[in-house]
Curated annotation (Swiss-Prot):
It comes from Feline foamy virus. This is Pro-Pol polyprotein. Binds 2 magnesium ions for reverse transcriptase polymerase activity. Mg(2+) 3 binds at D875, D937. Its cofactor is Mg(2+). Its EC number is 2.7.7.49, 2.7.7.7, 3.1.26.4, 3.4.23.-. The reverse transcriptase/ribonuclease H (RT) is structured in five subdomains: finger, palm, thumb, connection and RNase H. Within the palm subdomain, the 'primer grip' region is thought to be involved in the positioning of the primer terminus for accommodating the incoming nucleotide. The RNase H domain stabilizes the association of RT with primer-template. Integrase core domain contains the D-x(n)-D-x(35)-E motif, named for the phylogenetically conserved glutamic acid and aspartic acid residues and the invariant 35 amino acid spacing between the second and third acidic residues. Each acidic residue of the D,D(35)E motif is independently essential for the 3'-processing and strand transfer activities of purified integrase protein. Residues 183-360 form the Reverse transcriptase domain. Residues 869-1025 form the Integrase catalytic domain. Specific enzymatic cleavages in vivo by viral protease yield mature proteins. The protease is not cleaved off from Pol. Since cleavage efficiency is not optimal for all sites, long and active p65Pro-RT, p87Pro-RT-RNaseH and even some Pr125Pol are detected in infected cells.
Amino acid sequence: MDLLKPLTVERKGVKIKGYWDSQADITCVPKDLLQGEEPVRQQNVTTIHGTQEGDVYYVNLKIDGRRINTEVIGTTLDYAIITPGDVPWILKKPLELTIKLDLEEQQGTLLNNSILSKKGKEELKQLFEKYSALWQSWENQVGHRRIRPHKIATGTVKPTPQKQYHINPKAKPDIQIVINDLLKQGVLIQKESTMNTPVYPVPKPNGRWRMVLDYRAVNKVTPLIAVQNQHSYGILGSLFKGRYKTTIDLSNGFWAHPIVPEDYWITAFTWQGKQYCWTVLPQGFLNSPGLFTGDVVDLLQGIPNVEVYVDDVYISHDSEKEHLEYLDILFNRLKEAGYIISLKKSNIANSIVDFLGFQITNEGRGLTDTFKEKLENITAPTTLKQLQSILGLLNFARNFIPDFTELIAPLYALIPKSTKNYVPWQIEHSTTLETLITKLNGAEYLQGRKGDKTLIMKVNASYTTGYIRYYNEGEKKPISYVSIVFSKTELKFTELEKLLTTVHKGLLKALDLSMGQNIHVYSPIVSMQNIQKTPQTAKKALASRWLSWLSYLEDPRIRFFYDPQMPALKDLPAVDTGKDNKKHPSNFQHIFYTDGSAITSPTKEGHLNAGMGIVYFINKDGNLQKQQEWSISLGNHTAQFAEIAAFEFALKKCLPLGGNILVVTDSNYVAKAYNEELDVWASNGFVNNRKKPLKHISKWKSVADLKRLRPDVVVTHEPGHQKLDSSPHAYGNNLADQLATQASFKVHMTKNPKLDIEQIKAIQACQNNERLPVGYPKQYTYELQNNKCMVLRKDGWREIPPSRERYKLIKEAHNISHAGREAVLLKIQENYWWPKMKKDISSFLSTCNVCKMVNPLNLKPISPQAIVHPTKPFDKFYMDYIGPLPPSEGYVHVLVVVDAATGFTWLYPTKAQTSKATIKVLNHLTGLAIPKVLHSDQGSAFTSEEFAQWAKERNIQLEFSTPYHPQSSGKVERKNSEIKKLLTKLLVGRPLKWYNLISSVQLALNNTHVVSTKYTPHQLMFGIDCNLPFANKDTLDWTREEELALLQEIRESLQHPVQPPTCSGWSPYVGQLVQERVYRPSQLRPKWRKPTKVLEILNPRTVIIVDHLGQRKSVSIDNLKPTAHQHNGTRTCDDPEGMDGMECSQTTTETSVDSS
């Protein structure tokens, strides 16, 4: 019956009667009480007379003496209708949620832990009883802040709805409890929305789950408000540390702030098939912390010694009475505002409290016991996420250790080497972690910044690190420690420049800490004024750095002092990170020592002669026994190449070995690259910062593959040329050095020519007019010149290489552009000749798996009708676009321009297929020559009015091909096909970064022999050969590996157009090698799988093969092509990889040096 009693509603001194209405959605008051008020919005209002739009006002009312702020609408009635939400005290039914909290136990714990006197504890107990409605009594209980609702959907672009993540089944019961409790309190409502945000459950330390929503999509389109939280470091530095300290946690503070109903939609999320919206500020929303903190700060203004950081409140006083009085004021304001307090997370009237993750005492701030427990529970990480979590935890306490940065550097160096589920954690990393934990557990308290005192900054530097300490003037305890590890550039600085670098970085932070006070800098520099007289020859840093350093001398806020108590730079001890690079050979079963050497050739050319030496030891019962040694000559290469080659050789020998293995090299570059840089190089595609291929790229790729096969091999660096008693590795290192030096002299020690028997017979038969061996034509002359077998043919003298070296020559010529048989033959015939060259080349081409995967069906095509071509260069250009390709460096198209007479090709990557891009490219190209005719298809890039005007100004005739008839532009269309094949084979097994390969593709296209003319496009265009490296005539080995490194990767055969793969002009047979078509291959990926044998023939059109997954599969021959270069269905060699017969017959011998 109490609900039927009228209520007293007061507005601006006018009192009227009001009645509680359980069905009212909004409070209604007479319009006379709203005179002079401006409406905040409009809303549809439903009454017995229908639905109509009305103005909504936000006003202050008193209902039964209680002041409230609420939204109302005006009516013609002379009394007020009040919604239940505005008078929650009318319904005396207590709040009931899922999990009840024990307030008596929490209050008792706070009373027992406080340092209050007996009287003070009684007063605190009375405060607990007085503000009983202020304490959180249920888990997920929410306050109700009566303020104007926030407008949060302030962006101009609607966010994109997001899909829901997979939910851990263990989290669903806890999340459901939270949603049910919030629905009871009106914090959530069930409502459909065009937006959706995924729910992301996060585990709590107690084993339960917290409901978190991923509002990144909403935050991306929401403007950031200007009011933001103060940085926690600034708050910690300005805390008043009285005897009595209290920290208060405002429970679910964001959920106490209402938002306007028209913004509910942007907060929506889906749970168990139903969509819910927040009626309050959601957690995770961009502007929630700023809006909430700003309200709490305004609410607590006037209370001394109070600091607020989001939902954490700190208050401290020296007097017990004063502290309790201000707690009473603080509790009253929070209760009247509608907040609730979590006593479980609060600490009242104590001498030591935890605030913002630190322990606050009268001495200063320190690390909490909870943080130290987390340190003790750290274990070696096995995933990248665990490593990052450990680094984040340690980095929180970085200001408590003077040399923190240099100690943690080895752990940060693991990040680029780690993968999602692998971290290369070693013993030295565990030692580093233990050192950090020990120092953090023993770290002293740091003092807070006192704004009435001058800031003292003390700096010093070692060879690798700069050290900084901040103090309040006259105090002994530091405010903070900072350490700076010098970069690679800064390590080259002089001692003075390293100190100035440390001063510069320290002052950047000191200006924030100074609080308007002066800064005094103490350093080992005797006179800062004298550094202006530093001569240019004594400077290693750039002039811009010196300018910024000297600018501090003019700043009136900063004064510099010499501190004679600081140790001189040269006397600082070396940094000990606990890392021992020495690996004793007795701890390993197999030990390899590698070295490389190079000497200058005594010949007129002055080439380098390189050699490598490798020694292999076995550990038997603690005694090292030399097992084998190698001394191998490498020809015209650098010493660095020899070091890498020797290292690669040792890794290959490690593959079949069992047990732990140690490889020792005297090259710091090789050891550091293998241990620290190789994984980063592999992830970047073996290019440097300028996107250029690394030196010796082919060797490093091989080493990376070997490391993946044997990641357990330990590699260490040992300086060379040491005395035998100075290191356990000295003997093996010196022996490897002797073998490498010996190998570098081998080229000139060998005097007898290494000829085959048939070559010797041919020379002798020619001299004695006897019968020549089979395959050697009698019309030619055969002689021995410079230890080489030479033949005089119609086109001049040619070398006949030994049979064991012919495979290398064919492989080298083919790998330049993976050309076909005729093109390879022409390339080799420039310098060499031997019997049955075509047969040997065909045998080799049949072994190239990459060509088999990309080349079309190799059947003889029908000859097309001859096309009349121009006879002079630059008369006519064909042009067309390739693309869109996968994005690379922002480019998605390639403009191909082909000279009609010579076939010379220009490739220009573009970001768009437009006339502007075309004109830009042709302006560059016409700087060489202006063509008479430009032939293209009828694409918009070539038919626009702008392009036609450009051509008219240069007197260029435009010629277009017939629509839907690409044969009209056959020359450029064929080039397009060749370019795509080149890029496809080049990118096999590599990321689709084709932009940096365009220049190499163009070089390969223009320097591949055309069978019809027997010349390359470059020769036809310019009349001379391109400066393209081919073979080392002295050692039959590559002489310019860096230039060939990328060309060697181009895997494409520039064949003539052939019939489509669906051509049925072949019949399968059992045992035949065939290749299956790839279903819908992506751009720049192979179109055919690797060769496999035909197992059974079901009918003339269907066969059974073993597919790439190892399963038997029936396939139509329309989806197959016969593998090229087969003879009666068998390979030329039994090697499963299809190795050439010459290679199979060749026996590889290793030079074993007698240990005596």
